[in-house]
A protein has these predicted regions:
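PRPP-associated nucleotide enzymes
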Residues: 1-247
Length: 247
């Protein structure tokens, strides 16, 4: 399997096919009974959350070190998911449905390549602002959030937990957020990592979920793409900080 190089835009479609595998896992979580038990897999829902996090972090580490997702990581990813999909009953139709549920095409993690040099500045600002927890919008925000977490840890010696929120959807629109069963907010300042804030729907769902867990927590947001009208809207004033990127 060839590497996926961030500098080659024509590799986006191949990258997106791999991300559809993770999107199908997220879709499975939304349909799963939280108490489901599978022989040999006592807590499948939590295991799938672990898989999403493991590969998001692995891909982020590859990008930080090599500016690409390595062939070994991709091979391991496909080998692991082949077995997992069989066990969970995830089909090609599920992958297609998960792909179609994206709000935005040609956005998400792939677009971070335009701003890769600015992530260090955001990490430094997040450390200075006292960010204690990152929650990513799955799936497109997962690698973005993990990448930022790595920078905060390795460059600024401020490790923070990174979690991933998946979404129940009506069509492509998120209507509710789901987190691990044992999820707890760490500290008092959460940073939402989202791929694109071209509207307020996803961010609103994430805000609601986090406020249900801890009404007084401070919440900031980082996004790769943001609609200018949304950026200066009343809605965005709910956030402590809004971290965006300059072309």
């Amino acid at each position: 399997m060839l590497e996926i190089n961030l500098n080659h835009y024509n590799e986006m479609l191949r990258y997106e096919r791999d991300m559809d595998e993770l999107r199908a896992l997220a879709l499975w979580i939304t349909r799963c009974d939280p108490n489901l038990s599978i022989p040999g897999l006592a807590k499948p829902r939590e295991y799938v959350f672990d898989l999403i996090q493991h590969y998001s972090k692995k891909f982020a580490a590859d990008i930080k070190q090599h500016a690409n997702i390595s062939p070994d990581s991709i091979d391991l990813f496909h080998s692991s998911l082949f077995s997992v999909k069989l066990i969970l009953g995830i089909t090609a139709q599920d992958l297609e449905e998960a792909s179609q549920q994206q709000l935005y095409r040609n956005s998400g993690f792939w677009e971070m390549r335009r701003f890769i040099g600015q992530f260090g500045d955001v990490a430094e600002a997040a450390v200075s602002a006292g960010v204690t927890h990152i929650v990513s919008a799955a799936i497109s925000g997962c690698i973005i959030g993990e990448y930022l977490g790595l920078l905060m840890d390795e460059q600024f010696h401020q490790p923070v937990p990174v979690d991933h929120m998946v979404f129940l959807r009506s069509g492509a629109l998120p209507i509710a957020g789901l987190l691990r069963q044992q999820f707890q907010i760490c500290g008092d300042h959460v940073l939402i990592a989202d791929d694109a804030v071209m509207e307020t729907r996803t961010a609103a769902v994430m805000l609601k979920k986090l406020r249900e867990i801890c009404p007084d927590v401070k919440i900031s947001i980082m996004t790769v793409d943001i609609d200018p009208e949304t950026k200066y809207s009343e809605f965005m004033k709910q956030f402590e900080q809004v971290y965006a990127f300059d072309e």
